[in-house]
Each structure stands twice: as structure tokens, then as C-alpha cells.
């Protein structure tokens, strides 16, 4: 299944706020309508919607998310927690968390168009897994810095997660540590996502 490229508001109206996909929020009252329908939803539907929430927020294909679930299942620790950590440490998501891109699709474009350096080298793979002590910077070209400056100028400055440090005047971000999954900030039950895939096999 390919990455979703359809109307974004349609998705947040059904699944709730997905800050990685779009900065838009559902209209007031839509959460109440969703809650009123929740009593009619089957357990399968609930697990499916949690999976879709995760997939659309991080902008993943079905195959990509399944691969991440498999990797998390083989790692030490709770599978759901490891899954969130893997997704949060993707380069496109790190750029989004740093505020160098307004959405994860926007961050992916920066990476694909070779505007981003990691430790001084161009990285054009959005799924690149960042590590503690990685240094993420805008490319040296004026266009690269202008694109990120536009985001800085137009976005509200939200509190950074503790695992990241931003030096905006240098167009530089630092990865201090692996993210604590409690900080993810997405209303998601990752255990239901793991359950969804465990019941598919």
C-alpha cells in the first residue's frame, strides 16, 4: 500500500489530530461525534484506527510500518515502546520535532531534495535512523537555509523534547539521546497497533 496523499482534513476528522501530517485540527465537536460512534465499533475497528493513526502521522506505507513492528518485536523492551522510539528517531521526524519543517511530509521533501546534512554529510533518506550525538544541519546552499528560515518565521515555537537541542541561528539541531516514548505527544495506544499486526499473522 502506498503512502497516503489524499485530503488531509478528511483523515484528521476521522482519526483526530495528526500533527505530523498537518497542522490543521479537527473542528470542535468532531471528537464528540467520534466518541458517540465508538460504542458501535468492533475491537478490530479500534485496533485498525490506532494503526492508521500511527501510519498517517508518520507518513508511512503499510509495508514500512509492518517492518518497524517486526524490528521492534525482536528488540529488547516492550514492543510498543520500542516501535514509537524507532519512528521518532527517523530523520524526517527529527526535523519535524526540531521545528525545521512544519510537517513530516515537509521534512521528507527537505531530505529528498538534499537540503539536510547529518554530521556534515548529505543524507537523502527520510527513514535514516538518527543516533545520540548526531548533528543535523541545513545544507550550505542559501536555498536550503531559506526554506528552513521560512518555517521558523511562520510557525509557533513549541517546547522542544528533551532529547533534542536546536540552534536556530546556525540552522543546527542536536540529538542528545533516544527519545522517552512518554514524550511522543500523539494520542495513540501503541499496544493496539502491535495487537493489530499480531492478529494478521
Curated annotation (Swiss-Prot):
Q: What SUPFAM superfamilies would the database entry show? A: Alpha-L RNA-binding motif
Q: Name one GO molecular function term.
A: structural constituent of ribosome
> Where is this gene product found?
Plastid, Chloroplast
Domain S4 RNA-binding residues, every copy: 89-149
Principal subcellular localisation of the protein: plastid
Q: Where is this region: Disordered?
A: 20-43
In UniProt terms, what function does this protein have?
One of the primary rRNA binding proteins, it binds directly to 16S rRNA where it nucleates assembly of the body of the 30S subunit.
On assembly, the entry states: Part of the 30S ribosomal subunit. Contacts protein S5. The interaction surface between S4 and S5 is involved in control of translational fidelity.
Q: Hey, which family's this protein in?
A: Belongs to the universal ribosomal protein uS4 family.
Q: What is the protein name for this chain?
A: Small ribosomal subunit protein uS4c
* Organism of provenance: Vitis vinifera
Q: What is the lineage of its organism?
A: Eukaryota, Viridiplantae, Streptophyta, Embryophyta, Tracheophyta
Gene that this polypeptide is encoded by: rps4
Amino acid at each position: 500500500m502506498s503512502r497516503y496523499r489524499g485530503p488531509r482534513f478528511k483523515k484528521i476528522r476521522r482519526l483526530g489530530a495528526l500533527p505530523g501530517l498537518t497542522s490543521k485540527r479537527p473542528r470542535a465537536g468532531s471528537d464528540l461525534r467520534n466518541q458517540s460512534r465508538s460504542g458501535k465499533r468492533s475491537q478490530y475497528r479500534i485496533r485498525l484506527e490506532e494503526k492508521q493513526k500511527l501510519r498517517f502521522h508518520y507518513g508511512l506505507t503499510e509495508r514500512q510500518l509492518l517492518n518497524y513492528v517486526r524490528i521492534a518485536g525482536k528488540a529488547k523492551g516492550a514492543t510498543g515502546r520500542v516501535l514509537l522510539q524507532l519512528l521518532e528517531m527517523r530523520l524526517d521526524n527529527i526535523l519535524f520535532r526540531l521545528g525545521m519543517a512544519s510537517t513530516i511530509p515537509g521534512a521528507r521533501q527537505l531530505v529528498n531534495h538534499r537540503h539536510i546534512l547529518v554530521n556534515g554529510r548529505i543524507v537523502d533518506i527520510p527513514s535514516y535512523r538518527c543516533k545520540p550525538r548526531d548533528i543535523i544541519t541545513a545544507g550550505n546552499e542559501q536555498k536550503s537555509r531559506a526554506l528552513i528560515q521560512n518555517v521558523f518565521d511562520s510557525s509557533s515555537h513549541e517546547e522542544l523534547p528533551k532529547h533534542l537541542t536546536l540552534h536556530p541561528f546556525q540552522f543546527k539541531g542536536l540529538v542528545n539521546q533516544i527519545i522517552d516514548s512518554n514524550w511522543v505527544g500523539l494520542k495513540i495506544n501503541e499496544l493496539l497497533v502491535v495487537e493489530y499486526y499480531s492478529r494478521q499473522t
